[in-house]
Amino acid sequence: MADRGYSFSLTTFSPSGKLVQIEYALAAVAAGAPSVGIKASNGVVLATEKKQKSILYDEQSVHKIEPITKHIGMVYSGMGPDYRVLVRRARKLAQQYFLVYQEPIPTGQLVQRVASVMQEYTQSGGVRPFGVSLLIAGWDEDRPYLFQSDPSGAYFAWKATAMGKSYVNGKTFLEKRYNEDLELEDAIHTAILTLKESFEGQMTEENIEVGICNEAGFRRLSPAEVKDYLAAIA
């Protein structure tokens, strides 16, 4: 109750030491569709739920898993429009790095720069925090990377994690299933099974998306490939 008078101010701390708008942004993430990231020994998997609002909706018109460079990809939980802004910013940051250094941006560098953009929106007047958390997968220096970045601008490296609705169940499932010797194929199955833990209804190739990142680069799996993986775990 003591924080109520501070809930609309982004740049003022409440008496309990919180920026309440960031708490609300994290609530938007926790209410969003589940997303999962798993780092395998030879790559990274991103998977997310993508339920359609209507049977008339063209499911290929908007993707939740997006490539940023040839070797980095991203997914979100939370507010889609905010995510699209960050995708554009991330691509621009990657291009600027390439123009200066004439080499692809390392995954860690991109994560740091995107997180800095998100952090700026927690201490500026006239704006609000981004209502998304990001999972960023990459491959450089001959090894895979997986990071999560939150609305506060905090970022962490993960072996495997889940976010969005029912993220606690997802993380609990991953803690039981994950091991560091996991290979990419097994990681894809594990990611889909993690989504299935909290999935309501029939899971099909049309209502989930999967992306993989390995030494060949980052790509989204086609619906036909996702269908094959779903058949394998049925």
Swiss-Prot record:
GO cellular component entries: cytoplasm; nucleus; proteasome core complex; proteasome core complex, alpha-subunit complex
Entries under InterPro entries matching the protein: Ntn_hydrolases_N, Proteasome_alpha, Proteasome_alpha-type, Proteasome_asu_N, Proteasome_sua/b
Main location group: cytoplasm
Keyword set includes Transit peptide: no
Entry-linked PROSITE patterns: PROTEASOME_ALPHA_1 (PS00388), PROTEASOME_ALPHA_2 (PS51475)
Location in the cell: Cytoplasm; Nucleus
Modified sites of kind Phosphotyrosine: Y121
SMART domains cross-referenced by the UniProt entry: Proteasome_A_N
Transmembrane segments: none
UniProt xrefs under SUPFAM superfamilies: N-terminal nucleophile aminohydrolases (Ntn hydrolases)
A family per Pfam: Proteasome
Residues carrying N-acetylalanine: A2
Record keywords, A-Z: Acetylation, Cytoplasm, Nucleus, Phosphoprotein, Proteasome
GO biological process terms on file: ubiquitin-dependent protein catabolic process
Entry's family note: Belongs to the peptidase T1A family.
Function: The proteasome is a multicatalytic proteinase complex which is characterized by its ability to cleave peptides with Arg, Phe, Tyr, Leu, and Glu adjacent to the leaving group at neutral or slightly basic pH. The proteasome has an ATP-dependent proteolytic activity. PSMA2 may have a potential regulatory effect on another component(s) of the proteasome complex through tyrosine phosphorylation.
Assembly information from the UniProt record: The 26S proteasome consists of a 20S proteasome core and two 19S regulatory subunits. The 20S proteasome core is composed of 28 subunits that are arranged in four stacked rings, resulting in a barrel-shaped structure. The two end rings are each formed by seven alpha subunits, and the two central rings are each formed by seven beta subunits. The catalytic chamber with the active sites is on the inside of the barrel.
Protein name: Proteasome subunit alpha type-2
Species name: Carassius auratus
